[in-house]
Amino acid sequence: MRTMSRYGITRIQESRVEVPARPPPVQEAICRGPKSPCRFPFSILFSTFLYCGEAASALYMARVYQKNNDFYWMTYTIVFFLVASIMDQLTLIFVHRDLAKDKPLLLFMHLILMGPLIRCLEALIKYFEVWQKAEEEEPYVSLTRKKMFLNGQEVLLEWEVGHSVRALTMHRNAYKRMTQIQAFLGSVPQLTYQLYVSLVSPEIPLGRVLLIAFALVSVTYGATLCNMLAIQIKYDDYKVPFHAPEIICVTIWRSLEITSRLIILVLFAATLRLKALPFFLINFVIILLEPWVRFWKSGAQMPNNIEKNFSRVGTLVVLISITVLYSAINFSCWPAMQLRLADRDLVEKTQNWSHMALHYTLRLLENIAMVLVFRFLGTRVLMNYCHTFICVQLIVAYLISITFMLLFYQYLHPLRSLFSHNLADYLHCVCCPWSSRVRSENAESTPETQLNRGVV
């Protein structure tokens, strides 16, 4: 039946079901929230504690190695400590943009590798100043708008940010990046090396135990923080809440993943000694060059939005540093995001399930191959222990970490409602492509779909 609507549009009706027209878009309402609260900088204090603890234990072990005439072990212990410490100082200076400011005392503290301590004192002093002036009205310097889910509904929140809160936020952001560099450029090599020394050395002093403990906590904390930063970067328009179950799940996942991976690397290196070095170098170089090869194939130009005062050489140095950090993370665990040098944001903001599946598949095959080498060739390593039992334990620990990863992304991700397809859909599509195709065909043949096709 052909009818004429009040807008003058001819409509063909094949049934008596009336299809309502889509309402015009409504302007999104903005909810004014309270002023941004000033929270105690626990994360800054904890990062400084890990930095000082790892530095003190590394210097102590270097002194012990020197007394025992183990100059080879002493050299590597100091090198791993110095590389991470220097990168930490440069990160804090870069984020706070201190080179353009007249702060000679602060730069001197960074020069003697004490920058995190003085920055922590600055953050604590700023917090207590704000706490004492809590009753006073502080003029805000900016307005922040973020989307958030309240009672299942997406709302846009707007709140004022004062100068003191903004300064503390800058301190937190700087320490988050410093923690990543400390964890993966310092703690991972230090932890791997000290585990190797413990494996080939007849005794384990208390100082080495403390150094291993600090490095392990630093790596686990850095990997957990890596997940949170990845979520915040991917969903920059949203205020992301993190609760205790999510943090506990990510911590268990990351601790099992990194611990099993590093122990497997140590056993593999202890089995093959210098013959294992080409495998490690080739693996790391492939991870390091992969983003640049993709950037070269895309034909894109070098991004110029990293820092407005940087030249092309400065931008290139920053991109190389980011790539080295990304490769170090990727070598020991999943980096939680994919580096895209051709994009403006330098990372891929979409949820790429294929990248995650490919990473864990390759790492699982690598780990299995390395434990098999240890099982059949490591006759002189851990002679008083059952090699088969150790291999099974390590592979099971890695599989358990993957299980916690699946649990997090399927049920505990703070913004899982924004996923167009969740993890279960991806696994169902990969494992059962025929049933997925049948399900999509059935969805296309529903009465609602046929009715919409019949409307002109």
Swiss-Prot record:
Pfam families: XK-related
Membrane-traversing stretches: 40-60, 75-95, 105-125, 209-229, 276-293, 316-336, 356-378, 389-409
CC per GO annotation: plasma membrane
InterPro entries in the cross-refs: XK-rel (IPR018629), XK-related_adapter (IPR051773)
Domain of life: Eukaryota
Tagged with keyword Coiled coil: no
Keywords for this protein: Membrane, Transmembrane, Transmembrane helix
Signal sequence range: none
Subcellular location: Membrane
Membrane topology: Multi-pass membrane protein
Family: Belongs to the XK family.
Protein name (Swiss-Prot/TrEMBL): XK-related protein 2
Organism: Sminthopsis macroura (Stripe-faced dunnart)
Gene assigned in the entry: XKRX
